[in-house]
């Protein structure tokens, strides 16, 4: 062993060894238990950031731990390579998205290797390659054949100046990010996959995901949004048509005072035909893109259509309003409004002077007051004719039954979940494999003509997709007839919805090789950010069920266990520029002064300018507070960076980046290195003889085995890696202080250092690889996780606390198997105890076995 720990030398050498020996390349082995560990694959943005490093370090720790458990471990990596940032970067750098993407992949691949992650690089792929997306295209055509894919018009953000569609993130304050033109909503035909056909199963199967955080499951339940309600019809006076509405509160039906319809509703269009004011209001509504989450807080606006609806049960006539809070995409695009019992309806009715008729009162008999706000609780019906006195459930059933009997409604289950719109009017994505013939018929591209290849040698003008601009690209034939290709590309969530399955057989001449897929799948441990809870994780679950129903996989769910790592935070600093804006300064260029409690009291940048401390916030480009992992690896070594990442906070909590903590992690590794070197320089350690140990030696060995037991549980079951590391550090402190004079002292240290090296290996593999060899062992990559010796955990002696009248008066060491009588006798003989009971009568003795003896005397 070198005298000084030199991470750069060691890490380069060990990484070469892994590469040359293909250490992490695996194949199916039916005789071995498999473990599939996966971190969400990266978007090749150019450089790794600390969030990546945290995610991939956790994955590598789990993978290496499972390898030491003797399992056949698959840990693959690839690139989520399509997407908008590549288009933006290409325009900015005057290149095309493809070369920019491939360059980034090469650079980031090298960064991942320098961090020592144990990936099976043979399985690597980039989703922008035709050999990947070809299978996605073919699977889409199969879904089309099954009736699970359809086309319908749907609204998009449209820039009238650039004549192009904008992604939501390209709309800034309602205007185009490029030319500042106000953005309009435009209806265009788009492709959808029927995720709603699987809504109930996606909801039910969440109950089987015991290894998922409760929070993620709750988010998905809310996103799917199952509700039970009644679908009912209001006739429209003087029109030969009905308005369909869905309600979860049919008990409030007798309190309806108006009906609200969406601006995009056919009835709204009809009413606006001869009404310019109404037509203008509809345009205003249509061009305000409203996310469902914003409805509660936005200003409620409406306009009367002049049409009247007829109440289905009591025949009362109520006005029909166009309301900006009714969305065409949700339900039927029409709602029955009960201002007395719905706050949104209440605000609208108050604003437009509409009736507010209460029909529900509190069940406890307290007074009902709807003068200031709606009463939204469930209660008892009144002013509802034959339904008076019924509670919510009874009224729900009775009103639903009456509507059904009269052919005006029925009980129904509704989902908030909408079908998955997969069309994107962008260039850098997989082409959608559909063509339209001259007769207007749409056809899937036949399998033998796939893939539909995205041309990579293109010129980006920053406005129109090159495959839309090039009219020749779309020209093709179908069965000998002229046809036009679809020029939209797939939503990039398509690629990430099945990539985990492709890793099982990346060379397969089909979307999957079922035999290989069923050996590896489902993924045993998935690791990624909680921001993907509702989109990526839901789409992946859906796609997996599609693969199952197509006969490719046998299980129902793709990910058994899910760990959502916390964000990485860092100090952020800024100064105010001449225009009053904030200029963010990198923390690496700031010198700070701290008070006694470690709080920053002053900060100065490299030019000597005073800067403001904005706090510890998420590392991001916009706040210029990212720390480049590369610099940290160059300075301290990959093992130190990995150790800090795992130790600084629990894996699922935010992590505060502190370079002082990184230095601390580095010091700890140097201490371990030093102890191993000093130990091995003395030559081979004598054999351990457990029967020959004295009390101190037994106690130290007990600490070693207690640590093994704790670390095993922390890593395998609790996934609290930080407490596992803390336990190893505590053991190290004891070992450095322990005497090393006798043969058995060295034997215990030898056992302890081997255990520590194995336990640290998943976290800091390079240094442990070297120390393992120094400790006289062969290859740590194929070693086994240490097991604790039950016998070593058994204590020969117990420390008993002695109390008189509940106050501490002494301590007593007794044999572990001492009886209560023996402990009482020894306790009574204690000098200090005798002093405090002298002249008193002992009333009773309380004994807590193995812990405490309390003598009550007066």
UniProtKB/Swiss-Prot annotation:
User: Could you say which EC number(s) this protein's record lists?
Assistant: 6.1.1.4
Give the domain of life: Bacteria
Q: What are the entry keywords?
A: Aminoacyl-tRNA synthetase, ATP-binding, Cytoplasm, Ligase, Nucleotide-binding, Protein biosynthesis
Location within or outside the cell: Cytoplasm
Gene3D superfamilies membership: 2.20.28.290, 3.10.20.590, HUPs, Isoleucyl-tRNA Synthetase, Domain 1
Q: Record's Pfam families?
A: Anticodon_1, tRNA-synt_1, tRNA-synt_1_2, tRNA-synt_1g
The protein's predominant localisation is: cytoplasm
Q: Which SUPFAM superfamilies match?
A: Anticodon-binding domain of a subclass of class I aminoacyl-tRNA synthetases (SSF47323), Nucleotidylyl transferase (SSF52374), ValRS/IleRS/LeuRS editing domain (SSF50677)
**Single Gene Ontology BP annotation:** leucyl-tRNA aminoacylation
Instruction: Report which reactions are catalysed by this protein.
Output: tRNA(Leu) + L-leucine + ATP = L-leucyl-tRNA(Leu) + AMP + diphosphate
Motif 'HIGH' region extends across 42-52
GO cellular component terms listed in the entry, alphabetical order: cytosol
HAMAP family documented for this protein: Leu_tRNA_synth_B
Per the record, the similarity remark reads:
Belongs to the class-I aminoacyl-tRNA synthetase family.
Q: What is this protein called?
A: Leucine--tRNA ligase
Originating species: Vibrio cholerae serotype O1 (strain ATCC 39541 / Classical Ogawa 395 / O395)
What is this protein's gene name?
leuS
């Amino acid at each position: 062993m070198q005298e000084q720990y030199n991470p750069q030398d060691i890490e380069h050498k060990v990484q070469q060894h892994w590469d040359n020996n293909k250490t992490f390349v695996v194949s199916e082995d039916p005789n071995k238990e498999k473990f599939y560990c996966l971190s969400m694959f990266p978007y090749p943005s150019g450089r790794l950031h600390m969030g990546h490093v945290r995610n991939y370090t956790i994955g590598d720790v789990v993978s290496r731990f499972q390898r030491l458990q003797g399992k056949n471990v698959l840990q693959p990596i690839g690139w989520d390579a399509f997407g908008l940032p590549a288009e933006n970067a290409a325009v900015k750098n005057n290149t095309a998205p493809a070369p920019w993407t491939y360059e980034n992949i090469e650079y980031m691949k090298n960064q991942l290797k320098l961090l020592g992650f144990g990936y099976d690089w043979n399985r690597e792929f980039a989703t922008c390659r035709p050999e990947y997306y070809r299978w996605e295209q073919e699977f889409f055509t199969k879904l089309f054949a099954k009736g699970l894919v359809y086309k319908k018009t749907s609204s998009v953000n449209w820039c009238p100046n650039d004549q192009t569609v904008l992604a939501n993130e390209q709309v800034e304050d309602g205007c185009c990010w490029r030319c500042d033109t106000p953005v309009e909503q435009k209806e265009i035909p788009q492709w959808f996959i029927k995720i709603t056909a699987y809504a109930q199963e996606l909801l039910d199967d969440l109950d089987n995901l015991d290894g998922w955080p409760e929070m993620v499951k709750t988010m998905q339940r809310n996103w799917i949004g199952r509700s039970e309600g009644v679908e009912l019809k209001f006739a429209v006076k003087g029109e030969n048509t009905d308005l369909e509405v869905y309600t979860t509160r049919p008990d409030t039906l007798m309190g309806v005072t108006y009906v609200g319809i969406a601006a995009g509703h056919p009835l709204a269009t009809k009413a606006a035909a001869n009404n310019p004011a109404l037509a203008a209001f509809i345009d205003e509504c249509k061009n305000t893109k409203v996310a469902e989450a914003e409805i509660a807080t936005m200003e409620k606006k409406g306009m009367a259509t002049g049409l009247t609806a007829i109440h289905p049960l009591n025949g009362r006539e109520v006005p029909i309003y166009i309301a900006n809070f009714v969305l065409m995409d949700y339900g039927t695009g029409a709602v029955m409004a009960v201002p007395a019992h719905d706050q949104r309806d209440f605000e609208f009715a108050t604003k437009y002077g509409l009736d507010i008729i209460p029909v529900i009162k509190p069940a406890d008999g307290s007074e009902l007051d709807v003068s200031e706000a709606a009463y939204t609780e469930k209660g008892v019906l009144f002013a509802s004719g034959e339904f008076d006195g019924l509670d919510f459930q009874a009224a729900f059933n009775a009103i639903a039954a009456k509507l059904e009997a009269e052919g005006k409604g029925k009980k129904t289950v509704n989902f908030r979940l909408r079908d998955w719109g997969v069309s994107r009017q962008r260039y850098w994505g997989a082409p959608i494999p559909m063509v339209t013939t001259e007769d207007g018929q749409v056809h899937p591209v036949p399998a033998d003509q796939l893939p539909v290849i995205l041309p990579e040698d293109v010129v980006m003008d920053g406005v129109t997709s090159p495959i839309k601009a090039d009219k020749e690209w779309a020209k093709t034939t179908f069965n000998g007839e002229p046809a036009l290709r679809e020029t939209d590309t797939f939503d990039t969530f398509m690629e990430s919805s099945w990539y985990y399955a492709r890793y099982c057989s990346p060379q397969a001449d089909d979307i999957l090789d079922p035999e290989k897929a069923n050996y590896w799948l489902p993924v045993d441990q998935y690791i990624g950010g909680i921001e993907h809870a509702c989109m990526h994780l839901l789409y992946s679950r859906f796609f997996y069920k599609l693969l199952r129903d197509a006969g490719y996989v046998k299980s129902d769910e793709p990910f058994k266990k899910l760990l959502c790592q916390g964000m990485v935070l860092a100090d952020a600093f800024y100064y105010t520029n001449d225009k009053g804006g904030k200029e963010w300064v990198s923390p690496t260029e700031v010198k700070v002064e701290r008070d006694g409690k470690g709080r920053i009291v002053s900060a100065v940048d490299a030019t000597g300018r005073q800067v403001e401390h904005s706090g510890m916030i998420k590392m991001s480009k916009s706040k210029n507070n990212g720390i480049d992992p590369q610099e940290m690896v160059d300075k301290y070594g990959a093992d130190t960076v990995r150790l800090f990442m795992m130790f600084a906070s629990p894996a699922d909590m935010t992590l505060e980046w502190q370079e002082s903590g990184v230095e601390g992690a580095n010091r700890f590794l140097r201490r371990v290195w030093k102890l191993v070197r000093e130990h091995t320089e003395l030559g081979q350690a004598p054999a351990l003889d457990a029967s020959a140990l004295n009390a101190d030696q037994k106690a130290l060995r007990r600490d070693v085995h207690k640590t093994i037991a704790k670390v095993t549980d922390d890593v395998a079951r609790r996934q609290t890696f930080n407490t596992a590391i803390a336990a190893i550090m505590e053991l190290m402190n004891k070992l450095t202080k322990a005497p090393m004079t006798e043969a058995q002292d060295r034997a215990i240290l030898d056992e302890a250092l081997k255990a520590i090296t194995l336990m640290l290996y998943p976290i800091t593999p390079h240094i442990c690889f070297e120390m393992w060899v120094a400790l006289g062992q062969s290859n740590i990559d194929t070693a086994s996780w240490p097991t604790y010796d039950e016998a070593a955990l058994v204590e020969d002696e117990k420390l008993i606390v002695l109390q008189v009248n509940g106050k501490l008066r002494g301590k007593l060491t007794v044999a572990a198997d001492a009886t209560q009588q023996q402990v009482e006798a020894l306790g009574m003989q204690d000098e200090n105890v005798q002093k405090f009971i002298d002249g008193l009568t002992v009333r009773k003795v309380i004994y807590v076995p193995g812990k405490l003896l309390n003598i009550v005397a007066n």
